[in-house]
Amino acid sequence: MRKLNLGCGGNILAGWENHDADLDITKPLPYKDNSIDFIFAEHVVEHTTTPDAVRFFTESYRILKPDGILRIAVPSVDKIYDLADGPYLKWHGQSGFGDGSKRKAVQSILLDHGHLSAWNHSILEACFFAAGFDPDKICGCGFSELEGHGKVIGDHNNEIETIIMEAVK
């Protein structure tokens, strides 16, 4: 089984091909058609424009084998807006990204951290569809041992910030 972990940072997964800045997801991916079983990209797609993200999803579709899985984790503007609570807002303010208000937390996800695109469930699903994935094979997912972002910002904060979705070729 061939698995790619793209934009891995320090989240190195055993048994995976782990790539960070060495592989530019805004360019054609250097893999043959139908050659990959699983692609995981955690908190990387928001660092591209939406058109570049759709191109990346299209490239992922090309290189995935039939029934291959693309798993994406991105910050969710909706979740931050809806779920931001006292502990999250306190952490956010103490992290230097705002003043502890919900408004600054939402602004930060949109404007800081090198983010070039904003995401929620509907946008992610529409972009998967535009890239060729069947809407019946797109599903939201819970957290698993793959995600490493919670190790950086804490599991509670990660649950508030992150949406995870899979698409099956």
Describe each region flagged by the PLM:
Residues D52-Y61, K65, I69-V168:
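S-adenosyl-L-methionine-dependent methyltransferase catalytic module, highlighting the catalytic core
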